[in-house]
Amino acid sequence: VRRGTKPSGIPGSYTVIETPIRSVVCMTSLQLSNFIKMGELDKVVGVTSTRHLFNREMNERLKSGKTAKIGIEGNFDNEVIMSMNPDLILVSPFKRGGYETLKDVGIPLIPHLGYKEMTPLGQAEWVKFVGLLVGQEQKANETFDAIAARYNELKELTAEGKVKKRPVVLSGEMRGGNWYAVGGESFLAQLFKDAG
């Protein structure tokens, strides 16, 4: 509900989130990327891993202490999280977890399932969810529309019949001595296909 308004018709057992939110903890880089796209990094007070973080502004926020590292999934620093007192925590319910202890902190946990999307535009559309949270629905819709238009414009360059020979792509990563390959019906497979 809009911040400062009384919710009506919502059962008492439901958790009410007031928007626009003032602060949030992001558990994945995809969640964080939506705040970057919306120009709302000032609302991100906590993040997990910074291994794949290449955003200069967020790295500066981490160095200055405006945003804190909260640990990794399954091993969160609840004291740090409580000291930040975020309005909510965006979680990935199908990852390693460790959210049981966070539930005891009393901060709403909101599932963000963007990484389960099977298409690049499906993932990009989660910017609309963040737009709702930060009270910028129109900007989020415009942001997504611009992403979709540019994506489809680039995709058209490699449409069937426009590319003589398509490369074969094997993608994945080495982790813990095992090679993890991208599935043929995955987000990345669709991205490679659309790229030609």
Model-identified regions with their sequence ranges:
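Flexible loop/hinge segments at secondary-structure junctions
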Residues: I36, E153-E156, F187
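Extracellular/periplasmic catalytic domains that process cell-envelope and extracellular macromolecules
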Residues: I17-E18, M82-S83, K103-D104, G161-K165, ...
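Alpha-helical, coiled-coil/dimerization segments enriched in small aliphatic residues
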Residues: Y180-G196
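Extracytoplasmic substrate-binding proteins
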Residues: D77, L88-W179
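Short, solvent-exposed loop/turn and secondary-structure capping segments
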Residues: F35-G39, E100-K103, V182-G184
